[in-house]
Regions:
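Beta1/beta-strand and adjacent pyrophosphate-binding region of the FAD-binding site
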Residues: 1-13
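Conserved mid-domain beta->alpha element of the FAD-binding
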Residues: 10-23, 109, 157, 263-344
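Generic enzyme active-site microenvironment
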Residues: 30-31, 157, 201, 283
Length: 392
């Protein structure tokens, strides 16, 4: 079997790319190692930048999003008895962010792709890649107990951090940058109405975050050791710690409810470059991971594939590789800006092991500056809602 673009991975990056290519009349096949149910049930972040929402509208995929989403116009940051209110529309000429779970985005993209007759092969495990430096790459994969071969003009590696695409790039070609922070996030989902705003807290006991997934479902986090055992955290212990870190000691603001999911997420930053080797292009988590503090993972993946789709459209229409040749540099410029922002927010809001009194006071001074400076809040806001897409 042959296709123009073989997309490995049916996460947000691969699915958005498939729709962008379909719109331009470019053939593609999506190969996904996991089952459809597994992919659709993976709970991930739910903060969508304006550009991501706009793209879903352009592609005609926003009907359910418009019905079920929530719009956030601000975030709050609490520290030392003070509250920093960052109002997005005021600071970014009207922009907002949208709350709609990544798993819901994935469900919408898969349903629309299948309805349009777009081929997605689930439980299709890639076992080998060949000819990446030629003009007809090949993919070997297992499906229903048999090995299959797919040839293509281009491979889009959208298979995540643990996928097969990035390791297929020769070690002498690829450079990786990895930073693991000395803490993790203990996160829960609960059946309880969320507080009014997405709220971050820097407390002497550590970071905390109150967010929402729906009007009836809350998503909360507290900073813990990276190797923390979830079994050490009873529901009561979690709620008590969250109240303390959110300066809600009288328990009058945060509503407790039944916790139905609990887990520890590592906090790390990872970047691999170049994001291209021959006829294979990396996108999304296959090329980069950012700390969750800035809520950027899905949105950064969407930006990658928008740039890639423009390059592929130019290539298949005119034969020009000019945009594709710039793909990696264009994406990495944005990636490093997003890494910088996510690193800044992570450093600003967390307690680090061994923090000296000097470092703690500098951190508090930075928060106090944010409290008093509109320009500082504007910088946070414009990054939070999403930087403009650069011309490639």
């Amino acid at each position: 079997m042959h296709t123009q673009v073989a997309i490995i991975g049916a996460g947000p990056a691969g699915l958005f790319l498939s729709h962008l290519l379909f719109r331009e009349g470019i053939d593609c096949v999506v190969l996904e190692a996991r089952s459809r149910a597994y992919v659709e049930d993976r709970v991930r972040a739910g903060v969508l930048e304006q550009g991501t929402v706009d793209l879903m509208h352009e592609l005609g995929l926003d009907q359910r999003l418009r019905r079920e989403c929530m719009v956030d116009e601000a975030i709050d940051i609490r520290f030392g008895g003070k509250l920093i209110h960052v109002h997005f529309p005021e600071l970014t000429a009207g922009k907002v962010v949208t709350i709609y779970g990544q798993q819901e985005v994935v469900k919408d993209l898969i349903a629309a792709r299948i309805a349009a007759g777009g081929p997605i092969a689930f439980e299709a495990e890639v076992t080998g890649l060949g000819g990446l430096d030629g003009d007809k790459p090949t993919i070997r994969y297992m499906k229903d107990g048999s090995e299959h071969t797919l040839t293509c003009d281009v491979i889009a590696g959208c298979d995540g951090f643990h996928g097969v695409c990035r390791p297929a790039i020769p070690a002498g070609v690829l450079t990786t940058y990895d930073h693991i922070f000395p803490f993790g996030w203990l996160g829960i989902l609960s059946e309880s109405p969320p507080i009014r705003e997405m709220t971050y807290a820097n407390h002497d006991r550590g970071f905390a975050l109150c967010s929402r997934r729906s009007p009836k479902i809350s998503r909360h986090y507290v900073q813990v050791a990276p190797d923390e055992d979830v079994a050490n955290w009873s529901d009561d212990r979690f709620w008590n710690e969250l109240h303390i870190r959110m300066h809600d000691e009288n328990k009058s603001e945060i509503v407790e409810g039944r916790i139905f999911q609990k887990g520890v997420t590592p906090v790390r930053a990872f970047v691999a470059g170049p994001m291209r080797y021959g006829r294979m292009f990396l996108a999304g988590d296959a090329a980069h991971i950012v700390p969750p503090t800035g809520a950027k993972g899905l949105n950064l993946a969407v930006t990658d594939v928008r740039v890639l789709a423009r390059g592929l459209t130019e290539f298949f229409r005119s034969g020009s590789m000019a945009r594709l040749d710039r793909y990696s540099d264009t994406c990495l410029r944005r990636v490093w800006k997003v890494v910088r922002y996510s690193w800044h927010m992570t450093s600003l809001l967390h307690r680090f092991p061994g923090h000296s009194p000097f470092e703690r006071n500098v951190q508090l001074a930075e928060l106090d500056y944010l409290f008093t400076s509109r320009i500082a809040r504007q910088t946070i806001a414009e990054n939070y809602v999403g930087l403009p897409l650069e011309d490639d």
